[in-house]
Each structure stands twice: as C-alpha cells, then as structure tokens.
Swiss-Prot record, chain A:
GO BP annotations, alphabetical order: transcription by RNA polymerase II; transcription elongation by RNA polymerase I; tRNA transcription by RNA polymerase III
Enzyme class, broadest EC rank: transferase
Localization terms from the record: Cytoplasm
Upper taxonomic lineage: Archaea, Methanobacteriati, Methanobacteriota, Stenosarchaea group, Methanomicrobia
Listed Pfam families: RNA_pol_Rpb5_C
Keyword Transferase part of the UniProt annotation: yes
The protein's name: DNA-directed RNA polymerase subunit Rpo5
Domain of life: Archaea
UniProt xrefs under PROSITE patterns: RNA_POL_H_23KD
SUBUNIT field: Part of the RNA polymerase complex.
GO CC aspect terms: cytoplasm; DNA-directed RNA polymerase complex
Gene3D superfamilies according to UniProt: RPB5-like RNA polymerase subunit
Entry keyword annotation includes Calcium: no
Main location class: cytoplasm
C-alpha cells in the first residue's frame, strides 16, 4: 500500500508550523492570547504530518475564492 | 506598459488581498502610459476603495449570512433526488442536502465518492474499469448462485467462471474468504463450494446463507456500486457508498483529487481545513445546482464557524447555537424550558451582550451604533 502526503490533496491548504518566536509575533500583531485562536486537534492528519505538538500555532495559507490567498492561524489542542 | 520594479515593490507592500494586487498590476500593464503621479493616485484610490468595501466593525455578519442563505433556501425544492447523468447514482440535493451539511450529519443519506484516476488509468476505459471492479465490493451474488440442499443440510455455491475472471478472483480465494469470515469448514471442488452449518437445523442453514451473502469477498466494504463516466477526456468513477481512507490507497487512484460528500470522513482523513473547504464546496454546489446565487463569503463564514473548534460541529442545538454564552439566546432557539431550567438550577447570569437576548428583553441591540458606549466622567475629575 502506498502512502501519500495529506497535504498534497487539493482540498488541503498549506500548513506551516510556526516557531515560538513567530507565534509570539502573530499573537502580538492581533493582540490576542493563544487560546482565542481557532483550534486544530493534535490528532488532525495534517497536524500529525507536520509534527505539531499541543500548544503550537499553525499558519495556514488558504486558497480563497475572494482574496486568492488568505492567512489563517490555528492553535494545536489535544 | 511594463511596470518598473519600484512600482511592483510598492504594490506588493500594500495591505491588500493578493487578488486585488494582481488585478491592479494587470490593469496598470494594460494602460498605455502612466506617470509617477498618476500611479500614486491610482494606488491611493484603490486602497481607499478597498477600505471602504471592508465590513465595518460591529456589523452583524452572522445575521446577514443567515438571511443571505436562508432567503434563497426558501426557494429550494423540498425533496429532490438527482440522478448523476446516465449512471443512475442517486444523490440527495436541494434543501435536504443543505440541511445535512449544516447539521454536520455523521453519515449523509446518500454517501458518494468522486474517484479520479492517475493519467495512465484515466485515459483508458479498460484500465478504468479494472480499478472500478477492484474497488466495488464483491459479494457471492456477483460471482454465482447460492442454494440450500435440504436433504444434505448444506449450502451449495455455484461460481460463474466468467464473473470470477472479470473480477479477478479465483474459486480458491473465495473459499478462503468464506472460511475466514464464517469460521466454518469449506469444501471447495472446482467452481462448486459446499458449506454446512455447525448444527444441522433449518434455522442455522438459512442464517448461514444470509451470512455468506453479506461477506465482502473483494473490494471495499461499503462501496455498493461503482460507475464510470467520461468527463472531458478522462474517465471518472462515481460510487454509491463512501470509504475515503481505503480508496485513496488503491492502485490507479489519484489520491490528491479523489473526494467524498461525507464531510466528517474528510475531516478524519484529510483534516479540519479540508473539511472546511468541503463544506464550502458542497454548500455552494448544492445552491448553484438549484440555480441560486449566494455570495461565497456567507458560506465561508458558516464553514469557519463550523470548524473553528477543530471538529466539524453543526449549526444547531448540539453545536454553534448550543454553545452560546447567553441563556436567553439558547432558550430562544430550541428546547426553551430545558435551558431556562438548567440555568435556574446553576444560577447562571445573562450579560445581555448579544442580539437575541436584547430583543427578548426589549432593549436596543449592541450592534453598529448601538455598540458604542458613552462613558461620562464627572466634571470635577476632568478639571482635576
């Protein structure tokens, strides 16, 4: 059985794991705490694929039908 | 005209969506000649227009989205079944499907998959058909006939040579599968298979027949039928029943373009972001198919709310509406008495911050200009 990368699927946008410094910068920029961000489970197939841990912040580059590309953030929870 | 690098850089640095930047660039390129002064003015106008077009703070986007989807929804056909082309695969569409999407039902009423194939399989009808047969769940009824011999108290299965060749399975494999599935002795002789129940009783015998009929000999459990359709210059498989995880691993299937209409399954296999995209696609497609045009932004908002917790949750009592902070807002939606009773027992307090609860108590809602509050300082404080 062959395996394929979940991120290659056309429904899945690009997920980028942020370093703690980058994450801090994002929180500063929006003036929010991490718990206010939308969530993603640590068991999510993409989160597993990029090796995210609980408490990390994932940056998602969505393909948007209106803005072409939009940035979204999710906090990894268990 | 060709844009100088400095201008391109200037456009890139603007706080605008990518689509607007692209439109701005191509618009400028088409123009005959633009002076530095004109360029600056164009940029200023574009940014101003963009800021103007943005949703203002305190705008009730949720209410607008609800109405924008709800009003066209009233014009949808109540009960529609659609047959996808000649391939008579039944798919729920119209209002029932829209309800199914926002209710985040675990299994849709008509699960179906769209399987796209790798280039070498997609162009060849015979190869596409082979993939289809490999995926379709094969039961004993596809391969031959099954009969009970009451004199001998056993089940006699006569396999059809052609049917087995077509589905690439041998009599030995069938016997092996049946042995594994039932745990009984299987007597295979050529294309005839004989099985007997543990206890020689009529009841056991008939039950055994039913069990044998249910065994999946080959293919994916739950995929009852696969049909092939030609779309453009590639063959695409449509299925009745859905099992994304297993189908993605099949030889010849293009795992990056294969989809299902089961949103929960997408969430499990491809993640929450894929589920969000699936909600948007399915909802837009359902509305579009009925000839209704709803701005995608409203549907995006619904999809965002449904997926913001990391799971797909429904818009309803067990999801978005049930999680509202306000007791009155929850009570206004469904099961009023339960919410008020529970709140009374717990001693909940309603801050009257939302729309619904303020309408209930007859106060101005905190939206738009109603959200701005004036705080007065006593004059002696100001003077001091």
């Amino acid at each position: 059985m062959k395996r394929f990368a979940v991120q290659d699927h056309e429904l899945v946008p690009e997920h980028i794991l942020l370093t703690p410094e980058e994450a801090q910068q994002v929180l500063m920029q929006y003036g929010v705490e991490a718990r206010h961000l939308p969530k993603i489970h640590v068991t999510d197939p993409v989160a597993k694929e990029i090796g995210a841990k609980v408490g990390d912040i994932i940056k998602i580059k969505r393909k948007s039908p209106t803005a072409k590309e939009s940035i979204f953030y999710r906090l990894v929870i268990d | 005209m060709k844009l100088p690098d400095a201008w391109l850089k200037r456009i890139e640095d603007l706080d605008l969506p990518v689509s607007l930047k692209d439109a701005l660039k191509s618009g400028l390129e088409e123009a005959e000649s633009v002076t530095e002064e004109q360029f600056e003015r164009i940029i200023k106008e574009v940014v101003e227009d963009y800021e103007h077009a943005k949703v203002e703070p305190c705008e009730a986007v949720g209410v607008v989205a609800a109405q924008s989807i709800g009003e066209p929804g009233t014009q949808m056909t109540m009960r529609t079944f659609h047959y996808a082309g000649v391939a008579e695969i039944n798919v729920t569409l119209g209002l029932p499907r829209l309800i199914e999407i926002v209710d985040a039902r675990k299994i849709p009423s008509t699960p179906t998959m769209t399987i796209r194939l790798l280039p070498e399989y997609a162009s060849d009808r015979d190869m596409a058909r082979e993939v289809a047969w490999a995926i379709e769940a094969t039961s004993i009824l596809h391969l031959g006939s099954i009969a009970t011999d009451l004199a001998e108290m056993n089940v006699v299965i006569e396999l059809n040579e052609d049917a087995m060749a077509q589905r690439k399975i041998t009599a030995e494999e069938v016997a092996e599968k049946l042995r594994d599935a039932t745990g009984l002795a299987v007597d295979q002789n050529g294309n005839t298979i004989i099985m007997a129940p543990e206890e020689p009783s009529y009841r056991e015998l008939l039950q055994l027949v039913e069990r044998i009929k249910k065994v999946t000999l080959k293919g994916v459990d739950g995929i009852k039928r696969v049909v092939i359709r030609k779309e453009g210059d590639e063959y695409v498989l449509y299925t009745e029943g859905s099992s994304l995880k297993e189908v993605l691993e099949f030889e010849g299937v293009d795992p990056t373009r294969t989809k299902t209409n089961n949103i929960n399954e997408i969430c499990e296999v491809l993640g929450i972001e894929a589920a969000r995209n699936a909600i948007i696609n399915e909802a837009t497609e359902t509305l579009r198919e009925q000839g209704l045009q709803v701005d995608v932004r409203h549907i995006m908002l619904v999809a965002d709310i449904m997926t913001c917790d990391g799971d797909v949750k429904q818009i309803g009592r067990h999801g978005v509406s049930g999680e509202k902070a306000s007791v009155l807002a929850r009570a206004a939606f469904e099961v009023t008495v339960n919410h008020i009773l529970d709140a009374a027992i717990r001693g909940d307090v309603d801050d009257l911050k939302g729309v619904t609860e303020n309408v209930i108590v007859g106060q101005p809602i905190q939206l738009g200009t109603g959200d701005v509050q004036l705080v007065a300082k006593r004059i002696d404080e100001v003077v001091r």
